[in-house]
């Protein structure tokens, strides 16, 4: 059984349970935002939306 990681949107306070793969991608996107690497952000958002659309809307939209 795959464990889930509770991840919270820092702006809304809403949370989602992510798989380890989704969580790694979420962290990569947030770091790319911080680094102003918008190509990586765009690609990460696209992939995350395909993996978990509900969590995308809660955490990244």
PLM regions and their residue ranges:
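Short, charge-rich amphipathic interface segments used for partner binding and complex assembly
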Residues: 31-61
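N-terminal acidic leader/helix
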Residues: 1-34
